[in-house]
Amino acid sequence: MTSWIRLTAPAALAITIAGPAHAVQYLSLAQAQKLAFPSATHFTEVQAGRVWKADAGGRVLGFFVFDRVIGKHLYIDYSVALEPGGRIHRVDILQYRESYGDDVKSPSWLAQFVGKTVASPLKVGNDIRNISGATLSSLHVTEGVKRIAAFAASLR
């Protein structure tokens, strides 16, 4: 019995020290959709669990896209709201799982994406500021938003 404890104690200690991931959900999908398109009366799913068309009284307001990228080690869930022509209307962080680097949820950092299109550089160090201490998170969110801006052309 003592040898069993001696063998498993280091593993148990390592798990305890590592601790659980730091996951914080800031917004649900429904909350993010409503923030992106407050006047929308209906969200129609265009692509299962990923893309919705927002409309009000039959008028298309834009598209809401949910995506997920890796931060440094763990996923970041975010959304991009697009105008009908593909211009970025809003970006939100829905869930951040890393223990640090959550500055990517800062409204001032996310506001940099507003008005950008597929023709914009959308590159950290160019038209998007890097975040010290969240370099990989800011890089990967920016790459994800750029991918969605390119995808927006297929939504018209």
Predicted regions and their residues:
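Flexible, solvent-exposed loop/hinge segments and secondary-structure transition points
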Residues: 19-139, 143-156
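Bacterial N-terminal signal peptides
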Residues: 8-18
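Bacterial N-terminal signal peptides that target proteins for export
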Residues: 1-9
